Amino acid sequence: MFWLLALLAYLLGSLSFAIVLSRLSGSPDPRSSGSGNAGATNMLRLAGRKLAILTLLGDLCKGLLPVLLARAAGLDLHAQAWVGVCAVLGHLFPLYFRFQGGKGVATAAGMLMGLYFPAALLAIGAWLLTFYLTRTSSLAALIATPLTLPLLAWREPEALLPITVLTAMIVWRHRKNLRDLFAGRERHF
């Protein structure tokens, strides 16, 4: 059952709401416009608040639904977390869009909502505070994502390895942003 759910999670994660909504609305392809990221923040820049919110909600659900399905199937928390990681992998490397996806932050937040809601609240709160103070989405993601690790190590240690892998994937996807942050070239809102 685990492998079937992991595959379904990857396929669901491969649905890029940013790309689909940009095509349906006639907005620029987020992979080749703005920041080049197929995610909610770039959709806000390119297509406005409404499509950005729809992208965010879709990406959150892509992370949440596979975890809830894994729980309903009776998988333990460790397996649920790996199923969620597969959904994020689908978002990062979508099968349907030549493996050119987003950075996985919203999908990871949805996954955390299903695994351990307090960790999701911590990450979302840290993201919002950092973004409010710096107006920099990438910095907010890079601060918020690793903050969940100590809480999960304490409260849900069986999810720690998958969440550590998830954190590494998100940091890796932000490597260009890290270079731009250090060089003072990162985009701000």
Swiss-Prot record:
Disulfide bonds: none
Pathway listed: Lipid metabolism; phospholipid metabolism
Domain of life, per lineage: Bacteria
GO terms (BP aspect): phospholipid biosynthetic process
Localization (cell): Cell inner membrane
EC number: 2.3.1.275
Topology term for the membrane: Multi-pass membrane protein
Name of the molecule in the record: Glycerol-3-phosphate acyltransferase
Encoding gene (name): plsY
